[in-house]
């Protein structure tokens, strides 16, 4: 995926000594080709380009790839990761790594079966503030941590029109369409990930139940009207969600 987020990942990889970027893939070939500029600027050789619905499958069959980095729309995270693991590749996935518990467990099983890493790229766990706070918690600065609160607020108003649209009939783009059709905390790990690390979740403790509660949707219908010029009678996701 080389739309909004993927190109930045390509650029960052060029700064890692010894890294070879051997292949680029996007549904739209033009987007993949545009990312060749980052390789050129770093004096790296051009990468092979794959595109279309199943381009990622051909990419994953290559025998010169160690890691597949996935930055597609959410619904393609799991199928691409599954394909990569089945082909013996390590996998790094932007959030969320899967769309339901069944997919989560399938990734765990595939990772263990094929002895390959499968990592969710929860960037909010690794900013300086979160890493510093985790270090303090691990060194007992806060004593025993018995309660924590995290949050993530992201105003997407400037970006709605830039999200990938599959064809001329797709007026909303994948992200607005998903929020229109689904309720809940669509990617809770930005706010929850750093808290989970401080609480040693899956390192001696675990969460058993999560409950997401949202407000009613006020701006959703207006977003559909603004971006697709059509009337929306049902926008499911609320304006604010608390888990």
Regions found by a protein language model. Name each.
Residues 67, 73-74, 78-126, 140:
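Beta-strand-loop-alpha-helix segment that lines the small-molecule cofactor/substrate pocket
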